Amino acid sequence: MIYENLVSEAGLTQKHLIHGDKELFQHELKTIFARNWLFLTHDSLIPSPGDYVTAKMGVDEVIVSRQNDGSVRAFLNVCRHRGKTLVHAEAGNAKGFVCSYHGWGFGSNGELQSVPFEKELYGDTIKKKCLGLKEVPRIESFHGFIYGCFDAEAPTLVDYLGDAAWYLEPIFKHSGGLELVGPPGKVVIKANWKAPAENFVGDAYHVGWTHASSLRSGQSIFTPLAGNAMLPPEGAGLQMTSKYGSGMGVLWDGYSGVHSADLVPEMMAFGGAKQEKLAKEIGDVRARIYRSHLNCTVFPNNSILTCSGVFKVWNPIDENTTEVWTYAIVEKDMPEDLKRRLADAVQRTFGPAGFWESDDNDNMETESQNAKKYQSSNSDLIANLGFGKDVYGDECYPGVVAKSAIGETSYRGFYRAYQAHISSSNWAEFENTSRNWHTELTKTTDR
């Protein structure tokens, strides 16, 4: 398969087949998931030595373990002897892990510690130091959110987040920090992983129509959009994208998010009081970002609705199947009752049986299923909404930015980075291809 022209210049169109091609999916495992930073867990889920969770990195499962010195390490969840899955629990606390096949035992640091009948059967031929679990070589944290990367040449996590970090820090850092409420709700959908990732990267266009019934029944601050009764007013938000594909849409002052009327007064009061405090520390603009609704995707497959408290990982299974993990995010200093109610509301709206989630899944699944059909697969998907209005170097807002609540700026940035990865054999080639990334995205010539 030829991978060079699946996305047009500036990400304006994508071949529909990218959502359903088996060969391309295998190529993505090598060029996307083995190369980029992938979300693993949060400090709040593994606070003590010996705490561990299992997570996915592409189709591979890893054990993420808090070490005795407080550091975090991650290892493939595969016994080095005969390749059996080592840990079947989603989370726990353990000094080590013993394989249920032949009983080989590994420490929480990944080292091979015990082999049954080692002397009798192997003599002195077992070199334990060479037979530890395969380790994820790079682990870094963004204000408690832990990511892993298999590629030694990748930029640091902060550099990888790029301009998106500026928008995320008001709530991830300056708010006083976040907690992740787990274990995640899990569900398998018959959709390519990119379908939900692109939707969450900044698609406000679909909200009024796709979610019309959910908006009406929930009576959230976004209910006036139901049924496309209106557009967000001018100046209601912005979109942004970055060099490495992470991007978002911002809806100003949307702190209570998609949640229903019973949560709105308490959330708006809590967020309003903190916004006033933050304005003195980080300025009015970033304090307003804290209290605004960000729908964001950290490239490639981690999505966040900040004020709605939704945190997603789109774990690929194959070219047409994705396992969706849904956590709730809450602010550390929220009252415990508000934390609980917000976490419950996340599962009601965007959990496995959530009504907003159900609205979206039909779109994702049919988009992906049609990608496997002959005529459909060869057609172009369009992402040109707002093209020509994007700017780079705005005096206030970093990244490539469009000052509109609705558009496809972040779609284009996501797929520009995607194309650069799948047509590059390593990070050096990606960087060379991306040296003029913002110029490409902000051209104003007709396409």
Swiss-Prot record:
Family affiliation: Belongs to the bacterial ring-hydroxylating dioxygenase alpha subunit family.
Pfam families: Rieske, Ring_hydroxyl_A
Cofactor details (free text): Binds 1 [2Fe-2S] cluster per subunit. Binds 1 Fe(2+) ion per subunit.
GO biological processes: naphthalene catabolic process
Cofactor(s) of this protein: [2Fe-2S] cluster; Fe(2+)
Pathway participation: Aromatic compound metabolism; naphthalene degradation
Protein name: Naphthalene 1,2-dioxygenase system, large oxygenase component
Record field: catalytic activity: naphthalene + NADH + O2 + H(+) = (1R,2S)-1,2-dihydronaphthalene-1,2-diol + NAD(+)
GO terms for cellular component: catalytic complex
Keyword Oxidoreductase: yes
Function: Component of the naphthalene dioxygenase (NDO) multicomponent enzyme system which catalyzes the incorporation of both atoms of molecular oxygen into naphthalene to form cis-(1R,2S)-dihydroxy-1,2-dihydronaphthalene. The alpha subunit has a catalytic role in the holoenzyme. Also able to use styrene as substrate.
PANTHER family: 3-PHENYLPROPIONATE_CINNAMIC ACID DIOXYGENASE SUBUNIT ALPHA, CHOLINE MONOOXYGENASE, CHLOROPLASTIC
Domain Rieske: 37-135
UniProt binding sites for Fe cation: H206, H211, D360
Domain of life: Bacteria
Assembly and oligomerization: The naphthalene dioxygenase (NDO) multicomponent enzyme system is composed of an electron transfer component and a dioxygenase component (iron sulfur protein (ISP)). The electron transfer component is composed of a ferredoxin reductase (NagAa) and a ferredoxin (NagAb), and the dioxygenase component is formed by a large alpha subunit (NagAc) and a small beta subunit (NagAd).
GO molecular function ontology, one term from the record: 2 iron, 2 sulfur cluster binding
Any coiled-coil regions, as ranges: none
EC number: 1.14.12.12
Organism: Ralstonia sp
Binding positions for [2Fe-2S] cluster per the UniProt entry: C79, H81, C99, H102
Keyword vocabulary terms for this entry: 2Fe-2S, Aromatic hydrocarbons catabolism, Dioxygenase, Iron, Iron-sulfur, Metal-binding, NAD, Oxidoreductase, Plasmid
